[in-house]
Amino acid sequence: MKPEDMCLVDFEGNQLCGTKKRTSEILMHLQIMQRQPNALASVHCHPPYATGFAVAGVEPPTCMVPEYEVFASVAIAPYRTPGTPEMGKLVSDLVDKHNVILMANHGVVAWSHNNVEDAYFKMEILEAYCRTILVASQLGKPVGTMTPTQLQDLLKIKQSLGIPDPRYGLRECELCDNAEWRPGVTCQVPGAAASAGVVDPEVESVVQAITDQIMGQLG
């Protein structure tokens, strides 16, 4: 990117200078800044792992990696046509309590109260975290999580940095609610007997014994 590639726009979206046309999604960036007065910069892109979560409609789980807990607070905005005011509104409705928004079937946008580099940093943290979660969930082992007390320590740091998070003030029993992630994901291929519909004789014998006992009691 060169200096002449930069565009300057006002808060109405009118381009004031720059040789190239402004992005069609400038309205979303402006709506974020209008809704969140602390937002000095915002970044929008389509990182593959984070966008995968957005397409699946899955918010990344919490209580797993400190950097993600301290620097990011993620929510999902429903899909609307890119570049429309409707899309910008759905995203900006979430920026009071979140600084990174997954855009369903689209991508990700992040804002910062510091500068554009910091907004990009938050985007990078989310992308690395989503990739880590996908790898961990495929190892066939329970995914380790922090305790609520450990998370509270991180939230105190986060709050001191002025980063929004909807979990401030929650009780410990309301934190780290990731039950669907804790067991991990085990990918197993059915054996030949299972695919052929063959029943284990020992299991069949136990089932038959229980059935006979129940029928005897009913008689």
Which sequence ranges carry the predicted segments?
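Glycine-rich flexible loops
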Residues: 1-218
